[in-house]
């Protein structure tokens, strides 16, 4: 609709949609005269104009809404429903897309947009988070907008509004697990340090001790997220288990857990475990069910962590840790098949348990644009650092970026180059440990994003895994690793600081380039760093068209089809 008011405002949900589109298309332009506007032509007679508050060399643009529809008869402010409809109609005609596909896409986009607006309106406490260092749980539930380059970053089919409010992190909820008594013959899994019965019993004893009287040698306690439990009840294979008395519902019980930024992982400050469940919900590009292949990757890393090679890596980078996923469990159907929608994997989080109030923050919450406008949580931290040290905000920004490079980038690039260990660290996987707002350590989580290069074969052979399924080719390494670690994560840091005027993105990226050049001089296998520093283009994931074309990223046969060439921002930062 055309709006009656032209009051300028922040609209972070619209910004995510727009930046995803701009990154993946070329038929837009900047106005040649003030005020600064980005123009998207719709046809020969009309175009959309967006007031640019900050133009980013890495496409983390900031806009002042509303947008304007400009036609031969004038300029009119329009709301998000209208501007998104106009853009989708243009793409449908340009690309000859089916009408039902575009209608489904638009509906999902609008549902995500509405959810984000409802969350922002409800979370009046968010601005207070800027005022102090956050603990782990607070940071996990500070993410209100989701992926900065996605047309529907808060999509969550098939959750309804009430389910979304209870089970997604946005409204800062917490809830107990739903427990089941299961015949041991229907439980599959693996545990590195205990047998499976001992592992499940320990988890139940620590998190739902009131249910221990339900335990026996043949009946084990098995937890699920409450929603996933309801979902499994509707599956034929699970109904068959109930019918034969092989599984009984014990209801919700025990300690409360809060959903983290990934939504499917849960955290409890008093538990030694962080738990990751299959969740049969489509969040952004994929249905978030685990697979046996993925949980076995966690076991592979956990076994490697017992080797001398891992201890050598740890000695080089003592402030770098991997949150180990050293066991997993799931249900079998009557035919003995492991059902992936029932899988869960506890992750060892002793570091967080020992210091639950420590400033260990997930990167994506730090870098997200302020939902109501104003400073991001990262910028607030840097300003506190400036005040504490009595230095300028620019100097504090340099100190933060330099520390991030040392604590996060250096160990990850070295692990790949010297050990063949690839950890695809995107913003939700990077836990920055800070002391007084300055990075002093780094925890990597979510082992499903791990892989190996061929030069890790000898190391893998020490645990009889030389033929592991997740050994990358050169092409896979260069496609995925720079995208996740630099484009998705590091440039979100430099862009957040740049948008706030603490320094230019160019200057901050030059500091990143300097660190990477130093690391290249120190490591053995330089393929990835040569590519990062010298290639004119990288591969970047295209979330807009992946989502528009209704791809499930987890099951797509060739994931490379959703990647496109992206001009290397570090090329302009040569020193």
From Swiss-Prot:
Pathway membership, UniProt: Siderophore biosynthesis; aerobactin biosynthesis
Knockout mutant characteristics: Cells lacking this gene are not able to produce aerobactin and accumulate N-acetyl-N-hydroxylysine.
Documented EC number(s): 6.3.2.38
The name this protein goes by in its record: N(2)-citryl-N(6)-acetyl-N(6)-hydroxylysine synthase
Gene: iucA
Catalysed reactions, as listed in the record: N(6)-acetyl-N(6)-hydroxy-L-lysine + citrate + ATP = N(2)-citryl-N(6)-acetyl-N(6)-hydroxy-L-lysine + AMP + diphosphate + H(+)
Classification lineage: Bacteria, Pseudomonadati, Pseudomonadota, Gammaproteobacteria, Enterobacterales
GO molecular function: aerobactin synthase activity; ATP binding; transferase activity
Signal peptide, first to last residue: none
Keywords: ATP-binding, Ligase, Nucleotide-binding, Plasmid, Transferase
Protein task: Catalyzes the attachment of a first N-acetyl-N-hydroxylysine to a carboxylic group of citric acid to yield N-citryl-N-acetyl-N-hydroxylysine. Involved in the biosynthesis of the siderophore aerobactin which is a chelator that mediates the high-affinity iron transport systems induced under iron-stressed conditions.
Enzyme class: ligase
Record family assignment: Belongs to the IucA/IucC family.
UniProt-listed GO biological process terms: aerobactin biosynthetic process; siderophore biosynthetic process
Disulfide bond residue pairs: none
